[in-house]
Amino acid sequence: MEISSHQSHLLQQLNEQRRQDVFCDCSILVEGKVFKAHRNVLFASSGYFKMLLSQNSKETSQPTTATFQAFSPDTFTVILDFVYSGKLSLTGQNVIEVMSAASFLQMTDVISVCKTFIKSSLDISEKEKDRYFSLSDKDANSNGVERSSFYSGGWQEGSSSPRSHLSPEQGTGIISGKSWNKYNYHPASQKNTQQPLAKHEPRKESIKKTKHLRLSQPSEVTHYKSSKREVRTSDSSSHVSQSEEQAQIDAEMDSTPVGYQYGQGSDVTSKSFPDDLPRMRFKCPYCTHVVKRKADLKRHLRCHTGERPYPCQACGKRFSRLDHLSSHFRTIHQACKLICRKCKRHVTDLTGQVVQEGTRRYRLCNECLAEFGIDSLPIDLEAEQHLMSPSDGDKDSRWHLSEDENRSYVEIVEDGSADLVIQQVDDSEEEEEKEIKPNIR
């Protein structure tokens, strides 16, 4: 038969012994403050103490002292009280420190409780936020006239009381009525003076809507000017003169920060304008490189896959990018600095020949050809003709490519680990226009 109260009674007795320093055989020093405890209790409750006390298990006759600098005494007090009572005193101010100390002491139960506490606190704050906005929406619907007078009360003129009290929804404190005249603000208590001008309410609503739409989008000064012209032309039947209307709109636009827009009632929502910033949408699956265009991602993937789809028609060397091929051709071949591959001496079409060895082609001078033996090396006469200056009929085509070479290089590379299929295509037309493909000479 199990007695459930025995465990709590035993913990209570151990806690009393700790408070009275009875049979305490372990001292914990935390930033100069000493805590007394029992080694058996610490051994059973903390993985760190279990490892620490196991190393000194042979010296049980002497008291053990442990020193910590990773957390504060107040934090360790909360943890030690939990060890002896099973009650964890968490608040919004100490939950992070307690969770950090519990992680250091390898107390998984305390870490789980701290995580649950943080999550529940976030849920409560979200619920309170939703409740606040729902109440503000209801108040805005029930007090629409007062809300409209809060933002557009400057359309009418009238004397205000020397001092007026703000309602709790608008703020607290006492504000002078005349001090708000330059901001076109009239408190809600002046509703009686605004009733004779109720015929301007549709006009004010339209201006508020226009202002909301204009401020909710990233705009410059030109947008504000265009919105002013739209407001002036949209309602020509207004009894307010053009000069008063222009002055009112200017005051409203100038007094409103660009990064904010009005919501219902007195709610103000911050706008960060994320559409103005470039969106990086393509991420490399092999590294952290991020690009804006798919063509740039395909070009970047060649450094991982080792693809070299652009061969040099003069020497057969392959490149991963078209601009690298163009730079190679300009600096090596088009510069007319033909050298022998073996002796590195300058050669011409008369003093050297093009030799093809497998897929590679290079030049050798006549002396080096005589050393190797001209019969033992294959001479590519057709390649030598390609290295000559192109004929007049071929000047329009910058590259002397066959029909098979003119096809776009399309290769499929499959990566089983990432389940990624990469299709390499030609660079965009924009890049092709920028690239200069010189004649082979």
Swiss-Prot record:
SMART domains: BTB (SM00225), ZnF_C2H2 (SM00355). Residues 234-243 have a biased composition (Low complexity). The modification Phosphoserine is found at residues 161, 167. Residues 143-170, 178-196 have a biased composition (Polar residues). A zinc finger (C2H2-type) spans 282-304, 310-333. The keyword Nucleus applies. It is found in: Nucleus. This is Zinc finger and BTB domain-containing protein 8A. It comes from Homo sapiens (Human).
